């Protein structure tokens, strides 16, 4: 029973270990929420009606809209289709550095007065300059994707200098780092082919898919192990149908169905984003390059500003921590053009062997979990100073036993868009319930597959490795500043508390607390988006153990980490 308890415990702990910036192998922006999409036209015809028709045709071709999750492959396809128009001389895309509400996309189109009659088709076998695109015509797009990244990560006094009591019973541990300074190297490389083709032009129906293979490695003494590891495996492997058009009333509609291996993200990752695990035999623990869920089925329909979707998937967990979890869900969102989004979701877990352990010795299973979720996002006006606001709440129950867990957050701040460097400052309060042993109801929040990056739900570069969005109350003050183009600084100050003193289901060393104060952390992230191909990242954090930790673990020391990675992709 104890062994099963520890595996269930560390499944919860380990599933959330992530880094401070999404490192999805497809794109550094992959999965980011799209805040704004704008178009800039050069050399529009003087005839107003002709100019309007051309601009509308181009804008309707790029079918990534505000409040959607960014897909680099679909974006590349839409850009290639715009470039096929005979009246287009050149088209480029620029993606802003991420902010609190996601990314902004700017598409610049240069038109030609004389329509070019020459073929716009690309074929790498005839023209090597087409690379990485393999083949492109007015109906099809086939491209090669590649990414590679290496990281140096270091800690001073990891696990607050006390790895033995904090990691006792962890099945992944083999001589971990701890007291003193340690560093290690890890990396990954991914290669894949992705394509899409319009198979029924009359109804604008496209068949699309992709497959990729990834290798990863770790070398040195890291968070859990000093074993050098090298691993290779399939990452993406999916196929789908996508299409759309315009109703008789003039409303745009689109639909999408997909099956296979691919990452799934719900909203900004409050519930679901880390749909695969890294580390252990897969290596690359902190780079966190694997995201693809297994057996993902996703279907969505969007008309005008209303979107309805359904999904089913199995998270790609580590074999030693596999909980055999299956998640089904529906999601409904209603948004304005680009300012406001209202959403609601329902999740159901029909299958899982993950256990919940109670203070009285009872054991329950995640199987039967139901999650009800609502959210509201508000963006400031495009290009202007303004308020941003985000809030989300969720309630968990279980059809097999008495459960009632609750989580919510509220984030508000001000973005100074019209000021040099476009700084912003915001405050976020987040609460994830813990279990009250004096009631008959189980109340500890199940963190599911949250995470993402340091501006999403990785709450603290170091503290997140101790406490993973369950029985946790956090305060975050965050400032973002862009001192020069393509360079971004993210500064965070954190305070962490445990709402309940009973912490069974969290870190084993902190199962019973005598204080609510978990600690504090200050961190700084430097991001340099040199180009669409090159990205540089540095993160440092200093974490102070609070009385809830120091009273359970003797002789703790403050925890410092410093890491940097470079990434190349196309």
Protein language model features and the residues they cover:
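N-terminal periplasmic/intermembrane-space "pro-region" immediately following the signal or transit peptide
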Residues: 19-185, 190-202, 425
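Outer-membrane beta-barrel "beta-signal"
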Residues: 557-570
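Sec-dependent N-terminal signal peptides
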Residues: 5-15
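Signature for the C-terminal beta-barrel architecture of outer-membrane proteins
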Residues: 125-135, 245-246, 250-255, 277-439, ...
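Transmembrane beta-barrel strands of outer-membrane/channel proteins
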Residues: 144-154, 207-215, 257-263, 308-314, ...
